[in-house]
C-alpha cells in the first residue's frame, strides 16, 4: 500500500488525474484492448474529473477505448434527477470527454428486477476482462460506495437498504428533507472492488481523518469497510494534509519521506507504476 499525502484537496485532484492519465496512456488501449475503469461519485472525485477533462481538452488523453463501471446508484430515482448518479456522471465528466456511451456502465436503480440488474453488472465486469483501476472515495465512517459499516468484506454487487446516518447525511442534497432521500441503493460490493487489479482511494478533509486512521493503522474490520484494502496487492491512497490529523506522527513522516518515489508514479517514461505501489 502507498499513502500519498498532498498539501491540499486541489493537489489531490491534480495528482490523481495525472496518475489515471499515465495508467491509461501506458496501457495503450485500442479497439481490441480497452482500459477498464471503476468510478465513484460525490464531491471527493470532482477535482479528479475536472483535471481529466482538462487533460483531454489539451489532447493528452483519450477515452475512446476506455470502459467505465460506476460504483452505485439510488433505487427509484429517475435518471434525469439532479441527484441521480447517472446525471452526476454525465454532467460532471462523460459529456466533456470522447467516451462512447456504449462503454459507460451505471447501475439502473429503476430496473424491474434489481437483483438481476446487480448480477448482470457483475457479468459485464467479467466480460470486460475485469477492472484495471477502481477509484473510490470514503465516508467519515469508512464506507466505500454504499458498503456501510458491518458490510461483508467479500460482498458482490447488490441491493442495500441505507443506514439512518447515510439518509441524514444525504438529506442536504434533497432540500434537507430526509423523506425525499431514497431508502435503497444498488452498489458494487467490497469484493467487487477487491477484484480490480489496482485500487485508488481518495480521502479529503479533517472529517475523514479518523476513517483514514482506521484504514491504514488498525486491522481489517468490517465496521470500517475501507480497511479491507490493506489486503489488496496494489492499493494507493491519496489524501490531503487535513485528512492525516488522526495518524501517528511517524506514519506521516514515513510516507512523506517517500515523496520522491511518489513523484515518479506520475512522471513521463517511468516504469510500471503498480510495481511502485505495493
UniProtKB/Swiss-Prot annotation:
Gene3D superfamilies: 3.40.50.1360. Pathway: Nucleotide-sugar biosynthesis; UDP-N-acetyl-alpha-D-glucosamine biosynthesis; alpha-D-glucosamine 6-phosphate from D-fructose 6-phosphate: step 1/1. Pfam families: Glucosamine_iso (PF01182). One of its GO terms (molecular function) is glucosamine-6-phosphate deaminase activity. InterPro entries: Glc/Gal-6P_isomerase, Glucosamine6P_isomerase, Glucosamine6P_isomerase_CS, NagB/RpiA_transferase-like. It catalyses: alpha-D-glucosamine 6-phosphate + H2O = beta-D-fructose 6-phosphate + NH4(+). GO terms for cellular component: cytoplasm. Its EC number is 3.5.99.6. It is an enzyme of class 3 (hydrolase). It is found in: Cytoplasm. Keywords: Carbohydrate metabolism, Cytoplasm, Hydrolase. Homohexamer. Belongs to the glucosamine/galactosamine-6-phosphate isomerase family. Catalyzes the reversible conversion of alpha-D-glucosamine 6-phosphate (GlcN-6P) into beta-D-fructose 6-phosphate (Fru-6P) and ammonium ion, a regulatory reaction step in de novo uridine diphosphate-N-acetyl-alpha-D-glucosamine (UDP-GlcNAc) biosynthesis via hexosamine pathway. This is Glucosamine-6-phosphate deaminase. It comes from Aedes aegypti (Yellowfever mosquito). The gene is Gnpda1.
